[in-house]
């Protein structure tokens, strides 16, 4: 509850609804530890997931500078052509982090990013991975650096199933920010914290051994 949301691992053969490009597999809740809440998710049955396509995008670094948005428009046009050419198959998009650039959030933030994505893509769900530049440089510690991400994008770690694939999204950026608000004050290690590892152990315990498991994170795990 301290994170202010609850999420599910969408099962194979189903999809959740979307808010723009964001799949609605999580819902915000109050952070009050004493309040009991009930949260319901609508699952919509779909077919054809075994032959799905996952488009993977990395390090967009959208910041509204150096013609990056114009370049992204050109890229999105090409990707939409691919999506159109494969419209007989279930298709999804996954990002691998650094969708934004935190030192330029004063002019281009998560709200701006989502407007760009919702303008660029229709009728396709985008699953996000958090990167080091998606953490709040003004915040101190690790947990506080992802609160902005929680509010706009969603969980920083989660899982979902599509067809015969179990996807796991991890946040392997452990921030040690001082909160000074400068790029120099942003300290981090490429590391998955204990909370995620405990969750991952439980998550994988529900996965059929015949499933393919795909793990996504921003920093390489080697």
Language-model features: locations:
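Short, solvent-exposed loop/turn segments at secondary-structure junctions
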Residues: 61-62, 100, 134-135, 173-175, ...
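Extended active-site neighborhood of metal-dependent phosphoesterases/phosphodiesterases
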Residues: 13-23, 28, 104-207
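A general structural motif
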Residues: 51, 89-90, 123, 209-212
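N-terminal active-site segment of His-dependent metallophosphoesterases
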Residues: 19-26, 30-107
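Active-site neighborhood of phospho(di)ester-bond hydrolases with catalytic His/Asp-centered motifs
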Residues: 56-58, 92-98, 125-132, 214-218
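Active-site-proximal beta-strand elements of phosphoester/diester hydrolases
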Residues: 51-64, 164-178, 214-216
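A short, solvent-exposed beta-strand micro-motif common in secreted/extracellular proteins
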Residues: 1-19
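Short, intrinsically disordered, charge-balanced linker/junction segments flanking boundaries
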Residues: 2, 196-199, 213-222
């Amino acid at each position: 509850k301290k994170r202010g949301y609850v999420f599910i691992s969408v099962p194979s053969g189903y999809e959740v609804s979307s808010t723009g490009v964001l799949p609605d597999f999580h819902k915000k809740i109050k952070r009050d530890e004493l309040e009991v809440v009930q949260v319901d998710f609508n699952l919509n049955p779909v077919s054809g997931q075994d032959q799905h396509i996952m488009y993977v995008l990395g390090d967009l670094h959208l910041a509204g500078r150096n013609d990056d948005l114009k370049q992204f428009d050109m890229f999105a046009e090409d990707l939409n052509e691919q999506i159109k050419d494969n419209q007989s198959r279930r298709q999804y998009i996954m990002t691998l982090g650094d969708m934004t650039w935190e030192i330029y959030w004063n002019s281009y933030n998560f709200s701006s990013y989502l407007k760009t994505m919702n303008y660029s893509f229709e009728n396709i769900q985008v699953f996000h991975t958090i990167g080091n530049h998606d953490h709040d440089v003004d915040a101190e510690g690790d947990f506080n650096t992802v609160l902005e991400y929680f509010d706009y994008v969603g969980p920083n770690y989660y899982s979902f199933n599509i067809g015969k694939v179990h996807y796991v999204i991890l946040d392997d950026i452990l921030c040690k920010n001082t909160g000074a608000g400068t790029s120099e004050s942003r300290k981090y290690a490429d590391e998955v914290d204990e909370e995620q590892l405990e969750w991952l152990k439980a998550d994988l315990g529900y996965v059929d051994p015949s499933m393919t498991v795909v793990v996504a994170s921003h920093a390489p795990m080697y």
